[in-house]
Amino acid sequence: GVLLDLDTGTYPYVSSGMSGAGGAATQGGIGPRRLDKVLGVFKAYSTRVGNGPFPTEFDDGSQSALCQFIRDTGREYGVTTGRPRRCGYLDLVALRYACLANSIDSLVLTHLDVYDTLDSFEACVAYKVRGQLVEHFPASVRDLEDAEPVLRTFRGWKRSLKEVREYDELPREARDYVSFIEEYT
């Protein structure tokens, strides 16, 4: 994740390396002239490893069952440690920031099928920071820590996406979600 990147992440809650697009050239052994397209890969929901601000994180109360469902269905556990990842609704404000910070050419959406059985779900379209509406990613970690998500609700599709191979085969509700993400970012 971009928010763990040493340069563009939510310092001090970052890793010691570059996990953004620039890391492919500086740490991946790929010459910068060999990069002609930048793909941004993201999940239909948000996750975070370790500490740090996470405005859309599911709470331990009313959302604990939803968190556990997404964690189990999406297999959101650390590969080496087995620790459960922090999960929450897709943060479109953070995704738009990631696109800008990394000059993303195209997005690749994964884990859409995790939502197959839900009646509805939400995505963050802005924040409220100390009572003020904020539609951009905050420059300060303190503002991000104080951010409350402004959520938009989407209808679920209640059908398996397992056999879907083409965009047009997606249920209308899934296409609506994808279209909203495309327009927002």
What are these regions (language model features)?
Residues 1-185:
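Non-transmembrane, aqueous-exposed alpha-helical and coiled segments at domain scale
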